[in-house]
Amino acid sequence: MQRSPIEKANAFSKLFFRWPRPILKKGYRQKLELSDIYQIPSSDSADELSEMLEREWDRELATSKKNPKLVNALRRCFFWRFLFYGILLYFVEFTKAVQPLCLGRIIASYNAKNTYEREIAYYLALGLCLLFVVRTLFLHPAVFGLQHLGMQMRIALFSLIYKKILKMSSRVLDKIDTGQLVSLLSNNLNKFDEGVAVAHFVWIAPVQVVLLMGLIWNELTEFVFCGLGFLIMLALFQAWLGKKMMQYRDKRAGKINERLAITSEIIDNIQSVKVYCWEDAMEKIIDDIRQVELKLTRKVAYCRYFSSSAFFFSGFFVVFLSVVPYAFIHTIKLRRIFTTISYNIVLRMTVTRQFPSAIQTWYDSLGAIRKIQDFLHKDEHKTVEYNLTTKEVEMVNVTASWDEGIGELFEKVKQNDSERKMANGDDGLFFSNFSLHVTPVLKNISFKLEKGELLAIAGSTGSGKSSLLMMIMGELEPSDGKIKHSGRISYSPQVPWIMPGTIKDNIIFGLSYDEYRYTSVVNACQLEEDITVFPNKDKTVLGDGGITLSGGQRARISLARALYKDADLYLLDSPFSHLDVTTEKDIFESCLCKLMVNKTRILVTSKLEHLKKADKILLLHEGHCYFYGTFSELQGEKPDFSSQLLGSVHFDSFSAERRNSILTETFRRCSVSSGDGAGLGSYSETRKASFKQPPPEFNEKRKSSLIVNPITSNKKFSLVQTAMSYPQTNGMEDATSEPGERHFSLIPENELGEPTKPRSNIFKSELPFQAHRRQSVLALMTHSSTSPNKIHARRSAVRKMSMLSQTNFASSEIDIYSRRLSEDGSFEISEEINEEDLKECFADEEEIQNVTTTWSTYLRYVTTNRNLVFVLILCLVIFLAEVAASLAGLWIISGLAINTGSQTNDTSTDLSHLSVFSKFITNGSHYYIFYIYVGLADSFLALGVIRGLPLVHTLVTVSKDLHKQMLHSVLQGPMTAFNKMKAGRILNRFIKDTAIIDDMLPLTVFDFVQLILIVVGAICVVSVLQPYTLLAAIPVAVIFIMLRAYFLRTSQQLKQLESEARSPIFSHLITSLRGLWTVRAFGRQSYFETLFHKALNLHTANWFLYLSTLRWFQMRIDIVFVLFFIAVTFIAIATHDVGEGQVGIILTLAMNITSTLQWAVNSSIDVDGLMRSVSRVFKYIDIPPEGSETKNRHNANNPSDVLVIENKHLTKEWPSGGQMMVNNLTAKYTSDGRAVLQDLSFSVNAGQRVGLLGRTGAGKSTLLSALLRLLSTEGEIQIDGISWNSVSLQKWRKAFGVIPQKVFVFSGTFRKNLDPYEQWSDEEIWKVTEEVGLKSMIEQFPDKLNFVLVDGGYILSNGHKQLMCLARSILSKAKILLLDEPTAHLDPVTFQIIRKTLKHTFSNCTVILSEHRVEALLECQQFLVIEGCSVKQFDALQKLLTEASLFKQVFGHLDRAKLFTAHRRNSSKRKTRPKISALQEEAEEDLQETRL
């Protein structure tokens, strides 16, 4: 970045804002890059501002211990500059009050009786012009100074809040909503930037009103209060409209949240929607919600319209109510009329615009300051003082709870009752989730480790393993007992955490760089081969959360970070959960057994191999110590427990989830059988029920129910019900997880992440955007590693983890920790912003847009709804009628040959009124001219309403049409298009852009149309009265158009860069929250504060430059029109044949043009910016419909296919058999991407069951997606002799029943989720739910089938969701069933239900199954082996077993033997089909065989 020119600019350059000229010139000529932005001035540095405010806040805390106020700290930092700019701003407003005095004297000089004053008219005109010049010179520096000050206040508060977050206790974080925290930083603090500029009007407006009332009293005496009274009533009317508008907006917010919740679920599960052919059903559901939302949107728009239009139409009434009563009683002169009109223009702006805006600004700002103040008062993480000489780690009878104790409860009650002030966030959350029982997550835990020992911690699900590590780190405060260790800790979290930055930055983590240690750690964690693949090696910049890495790569980088730090104690929370067996074993040996052999290690694990090699074992069950000792002691003291685990074949080769399930069940059985369960059981009974869980009887029934998930049965909800933000991995490494509720320990005990394939793959899990369910910060820390709005990396871009053998560290005598590195280190963070790194970290896929909105966008927007064209024509006709009436009035006046002038108001609607009114003031004609004036005013006022209200109404209708078209295009778009787009970016069109088009655009367009017509109409009238003014008007119009075009090219680019620069701030905030425990464990708070300040400085550089260029433009527009006013003034005065009425009209209109034009210019810029949202929406509307690409490709290759629309021989019963033939199938995720499947050919007989085999990433799931035509495909597939080229997409997909790994459950009733098209009766649905075992569960909910599920059906277990998917397949009556690892997340019971249902209900269907469980493949007759993107083998089981094929690599010896035995049994005579009613008994029998 270049140094900012403002630092070396002189006073003249700063006054006239000449210093931003280089960036404006560059932006006009070429596209601006981040490197083109200037560095921030030193006074705007986040470090300096935060230090200043933090110092004053600490001073406030010290001096005002009882009631410290943040506003006092802000006052001490910024008050004097704020006051200086306020005085400057009042001086500007004072000049506006003086201008009518000069105008009155100029008009008086044209009176025939005042010929002596005619000579001084030129001096008066010069004085009037100088007032405008002075106003322009002082206004813009004052406004810019206040905006700059508001920006500095926001930066300081941003930094203060971030520092507080890093200090906040984990208990408090569990009660803070993540969305509210982000809102605190964005919505509330953004009020300072623009709000400070108008804050001074809270005192300027009353002073101005008093001054103006005194000046108008001098003209109209006591009648001045008539106009003022009307303005006050108008302000009260606007306040009432504002209150009504807020009521409507509150009601609408619920509908918006409902619409966005379903929209986000649909977008994140778009492949499921397409597979089930639910596009039309989902569109109807959203449209129904949208209709209700739009009714409230119209009411909000009407309120805003009447509030805005009240300003435009109030001018006439104010003048009429003030002047008319005075005219009937006293003699009135034209000078008084025009002077009064000018005063009232200023008074109207002050009362109806400036003062209400200032009040609203102070209300919002003080509310934001109170929220921030309450946040800063929350409890902080307590830093414990440790004895650094301590060698051992000891814990004695420690008990701890994440809940609050009774004493704390009463303390809060007392404090709340005594203060009775603004509700504190903690209080509200605490009482809304109050529990009478304190539930210890750990109870009476004791152990002792000497230096160099390894402690392995294992336990049942939710037993408190991770909470134990949190307690050692000081994140969880013990309520009893003592903990002893040195405090030098390193930590590897359960969910791998990656910060934005390079790979090297993530491993070193701000410590000094030691090449030998770094190389040793990289090799030990098997990262060397991964790093060499990246183009920039370890300097490769990783995105937020490491979204470009696979789960295993993230896990190994997280482990390497922990190893690189030289600590006394290493806490490793399930660090190997994302790795395969071979890699895990190698890393365990190289890291824990060799590299860290002299260090004290605590490892959370569920593997027997780790327990055997550990020096000590700690087994936890429901927070209690089940066993502590060595492995040999475990075999002696707990023979039942150890024998059951050792008797489980290949226990360590199971997935982590299944191992946890087995451990949990084993603990339960052994605890009960050994009598240990008494204590544990009583403790277990104290656990709290979920806020949203079903009634107690539901849990009792479920215990004996067939559908019991042992993994989720022991889970606990936290004090505050939170939304889940699930872990996610990218790439080809196996990783699975249980996205369940919060566990008893508040730490997720699921030890595997969830695999993520490209979006087109329905079978691979993708997580729904949690639209409105509350997510606490603690949940974010414990459940998520990447943002839900994630980049879906293509599978080809991610490489499988390294499997190379590593260096034998046993042969090395050098200890990598022998040379201790500095904690703060020499790893310095450059103060200069590395914009390229930041840009890469937060890379966006936003397509390049035009610098400014094109005319084609405006034209398309206008023609979206033809009524808008008619309304715009109506507006133009009314405008021409108003101008024509004004000109007719002028003609009538000249025809009467009365030598008087005319007057005007500030709107084009009132121009003719002023003409007639001014003619009327003569010595004898009072009453009839008043009647004419009033009649004309009423009629033109009505025409103004006719013009504005239909415009706003029609613009809202256009918004409805755009949303409907965009939704339809997105739902009907091809999956190949979704593979290139972020889910979050699509959702932004429905959130941000739709809100802009609904709310902001209609009223902004109305303001712009109204203002531009006022200016144009005034110029027309002035030009008719004085044709010479055209000599000034035409050049001014040209200059204005050129200036606007010149400025917009740069400003829109700066606005875009500013928007992009805002992303790293919030991304860093979320990243810090996710890794807060890691940051604290490593003591890197100051390092992260510096990174946050760099992100703040980057945004400041963009925002400050935007404000500066905006002020450059606005000042030049003012200068141009001041020159225009000067020209018009002296032309009017220099003309000898004009009367005082014409001079009054010309000068009053010219003054009105100058004051109105700035507003009109700002509106035009706003409209151009808002239309960019319309442009983005159009790009999504233009997404080609699904099937168009395939159709075009086939048409190009084979013209005969053009005539094939639908096969005439297709019957309603198709497909009847389910026979499928695949010929030369090639599939790509994008039309221009590489082939992920190449020339696959095979055939499946009707009713046959085929198993898909292959390594992870071989293409099994891709094949299932290709069969459903979700990808860009070539080749041919036939079902029962019918080719897919002759069948519509919906018809083709309805031939398949699909059971994916992750089920799509949208917000809606059970019935809607099972049958969204409402094709089946309740009886048929109940029959199917009973068949799959869901009936008893659904009946336990209040409304049964009409019970509404929200947030992806979070209240249901994964088993229930899979059974719902099974029920959908039964209802679809499909003849071909596709299954992709449907049992990956299931407990044994639900697995048996699905297995039995497939065996009986789908006995006559063709089944294609991709599965890793041997038990699931027992029924398959044929196996398709995929390797290298093509079919390796397609044979029966016997041939695969006899040949040296890939099959032998996929399954072990015991698994192959089990398959062979099952196949022989299946090849014999089939058993008679049992009754479905026997399903439960059979499942219970098989459960005993498969549970262990």
UniProtKB/Swiss-Prot annotation:
Parts of the chain that traverse the membrane: 79-99, 124-147, 197-217, 224-244, 300-320, 341-359, 868-888, 933-953, 1005-1025, 1028-1048, 1110-1130, 1145-1165
Family: Belongs to the ABC transporter superfamily. ABCC family. CFTR transporter (TC 3.A.1.202) subfamily.
Catalyzed reactions per annotation: ATP + H2O + closed Cl(-) channel = ADP + phosphate + open Cl(-) channel; chloride(in) = chloride(out); hydrogencarbonate(in) = hydrogencarbonate(out); ATP + H2O = ADP + phosphate + H(+)
Keywords assigned by UniProt, alphabetized: ATP-binding, Cell membrane, Chloride, Chloride channel, Endoplasmic reticulum, Endosome, Glycoprotein, Ion channel, Ion transport, Isomerase, Membrane, Nucleotide-binding, Phosphoprotein, Repeat, Transmembrane, Transmembrane helix, Transport
Record's keyword annotation contains Repeat: yes
Enzyme class, broadest EC rank: isomerase
Major localization listed first in the record, in broad terms: membrane
Topology Extracellular: residue spans: 100-123, 218-223, 321-340, 889-932, 1026-1027, 1131-1144
Organismal lineage: Eukaryota, Metazoa, Chordata, Craniata, Vertebrata
Membrane topology note: Multi-pass membrane protein
Species this protein is from: Squalus acanthias (Spiny dogfish)
Protein name: Cystic fibrosis transmembrane conductance regulator
Record-level GO BP terms: bicarbonate transport; cellular response to cAMP; cellular response to forskolin; chloride transmembrane transport; intracellular pH elevation; membrane hyperpolarization; multicellular organismal-level water homeostasis; sperm capacitation
CDD domains in the cross-refs: ABC_6TM_CFTR_D1 (cd18594)
Acidic residues bias: start-end ranges: 1481-1492
Domain ABC transporter: 424-647, 1220-1453
Domain ABC transmembrane type-1: 82-366, 868-1169
